[in-house]
Regions:
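Pyridoxal 5′-phosphate
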Residues: 3-305
């Protein structure tokens, strides 16, 4: 909802939008709808087989009517982290906004909206922020006016025929998820006390431990560029096995939860050449242990025999 709010609230008919192959369907489908129903123009920066982009493509794709660059902070399939500061410098030099999907980084990766040049930051609460499902939000740079995606009850200005224009009420029609917000607040307090940098360092250490353990196993294909800093996920396939079957065996036989299939990232799977088979994604948390990582490596090795 929060991504749709930002996209629909800032893009007008005829506007040009630049996005990337790294995007989740929560970004892609709102953009596709704007293209189909409102005449928006879309361009996509391609990803290579490692999940990386050529930043010169952002400049190449700019047009006089480019309204915004809408992109993820990090891929939910390969963990590739985009250089948002570099993208923002290009976008702002052409008068375009920068709308960032931080679902994969909020809470587990340092984010500085001002330094990075982010105009609108969208995030979900149930991933790196460790909050309940059904929570999320938008951080909006001062001076940017987002049209409300929905209007209705607000609890204030009840005699007005129009929805309140002041933030945050303008984007908060209806009864809010109070329980979820309380849970997200508690999670944010924990993250603030623990430190995003400390969380990132531990998760990265666990991710690299797993990668080093599986990368040379015969029959295992690992996706992504591990020469660069990335988020704490590893996507792989085992021989020609269907990813759903591998995930099922990991769950039933080893008690390991993974995410198989397309990951709501169709363009990225096409770039990696995995559109037909999908992949098995391992995600590593601050609460995981090295012993659990080693058990996951052993499980992959056994399934690959």
């Amino acid at each position: 909802m929060y991504k749709r709010q930002a996209i629909n609230g800032l893009i007008d008919p005829g506007d040009h939008v630049i996005s990337t192959d790294l995007e989740h369907n929560s970004v892609l489908r709102p953009l596709y709808r704007l293209e189909a129903e409102h005449g928006a123009e879309l361009s996509f920066v391609p990803a290579d087989k490692l999940g990386n982009v050529d930043y010169a493509d952002f400049e190449r794709l700019m047009k006089p009517n480019t309204r915004a660059v809408v992109c993820t902070n990090a891929s939910n399939l390969t963990g590739t982290v985009l250089d948002i500061e570099r993208i923002a410098k290009t976008a702002h030099s052409h008068g375009a906004l920068v709308i960032v999907d931080a679902s994969q980084t909020a809470g587990c990766w340092p984010i500085d909206m001002k330094k990075m040049g982010i105009d609108v930051l969208c995030f979900t609460g149930h991933k790196g922020l460790m909050g309940p499902q059904g929570t999320g939000g938008i951080c909006v740079k001062e001076g940017i006016e987002i049209r409300p995606f929905k209007v209705g009850g607000s609890g204030v200005q009840s005699y007005s025929r129009t929805h309140p224009a002041e933030y945050p009420t303008r984007l908060e029609a209806g009864t809010l998820n109070g329980h979820g917000i309380a849970g997200l607040g508690a999670a944010a307090k924990f993250i603030s006390e623990t430190g995003v940098e400390n969380i990132h360092a531990k998760e990265r250490s666990l991710m690299l431990r797993f990668y080093e353990g599986v990368k040379n196993i015969e029959g295992v294909t690992v996706y992504g560029d591990f020469t660069k800093d990335k988020t704490a996920i590893v996507a792989l396939n085992i021989r020609d096995y269907e990813s759903g079957e591998v995930s099922y065996e990991l769950s039933q036989g080893y008690g390991i939860a993974t995410r198989p299939g397309a990951h709501c990232a169709p363009r990225m799977h096409k770039a990696l050449g995995t559109a037909e088979v999908g992949a098995v994604r391992f995600s590593f948390s601050f609460y995981n242990t090295e012993e659990e990582i080693d058990e996951a490596v052993r499980a992959v090795a056994e399934l690959a025999k």
